Amino acid sequence: MTLLAGFDAGQTHTRCRLSLVKNGLLQPVGEGEGPGVSHLDAPLGEERFLKAIRTSAQHALKNHPTGLIQAAVVGASGIEHGTGLQQRAEALVGQALAIGDGSRLGKVLVTGDERTALRGAIPEGAGILAISGTGMIVLGRGEDGHEHRCGGWGWLLDGAGSAFDLGHQGLQLTLRMADGRLPDHPLRLQIWNQMGCDSHAAVKARVVQNDFGTADFAALAPLVVEAASQGCSGAEEIVQRSAVTLSNCIDAVARRLSLLSPLVVCQGGAITHLMGFRTAVQQTMRQSIPGARWGDAKGDACDGALLMAQDLTVRPS
């Protein structure tokens, strides 16, 4: 059995979906999950990447032990398209999938997970995918097939427009309340209680612990958005600033690709579950891109990876 493999390799877990191609259409036949990946240059980065690809593929192949993977595409967090990092990752995929008879894949592509997500969400034609979860990135495709990205540089460099940004700014707001720069508000205790803190000193100590990271900041975002909806002026300003940043990224992609009335698909917990934040983004966009059309994703990142793998099989070697 000849199969295509599509991977969605994130920081928390990796999914592999296998598919047959019948009459030009993809027919999924298996799915497996493995651990997450990190940047290849991070400590144990290559080892984690190998384990993620190998484990998820093995689980997906459990009901197809004789299956041969003809082509594989991986959308991975931290991979920059067109770099040496991409080439290293592709070599690792070939190594990870040297299964069964030990043969190596001839057709492999590793790219950023935002690109497989865009292909899955908008398989054909022009459109923009805005991802706002723990992090944020916007990627669009023009009428000519050209793609342009905005944001996605990581929280250390550019985390605005994300749940991390909302939570991080919210925590900073509570410290300004605590030291008297701003009037106190119930949001302060709500955030501190969620963090397990009872004082500003405890907050300061908590954020430097090894087990406190971007996801923990992001987990504070719902409290900030809820406080904004109840009239907390500081929280309202945070939500508005973050919404403007995300909207500006969407606008920048639309302008770069000359899209006057783009289809915009949103993914990620911040933009899909935090309604106050989503509404703020939509209101801002109505001013900057009045012709924008909001739509639903046709598929997920694994679907996008499989479509790209199918492209590899018809592309001349």
Model regions and ranges:
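ATP-binding/phosphotransfer module of carbohydrate and carboxylate kinases, centering on a glycine-rich
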Residues: 1-69, 120-128, 173-317
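Short glycine-rich anion-binding loops that position phosphate/pyrophosphate groups of nucleotides
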Residues: 12, 78-79, 134-137
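Short beta-strand-loop/turn "lid" adjacent to the catalytic site in phosphate-handling enzymes
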Residues: 38, 57-96, 100, 109-110, ...
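A short glycine/serine-rich beta->alpha loop
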Residues: 39-40, 78-80, 152-160, 291-296
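Short, active-site-adjacent cap segments at secondary-structure transitions
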Residues: 80-82, 116-118, 137-138, 271-274
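Glycine/charged-rich beta-loop-alpha catalytic/anionic-binding loops adjacent to active sites
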Residues: 94-103, 146-154, 284-293
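Active-site neighborhood for divalent-cation/phosphate handling
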Residues: 99-129, 140-148
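Glycine-rich phosphate-binding loop of actin/hexokinase-like ATP-binding domains
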Residues: 125-177, 181
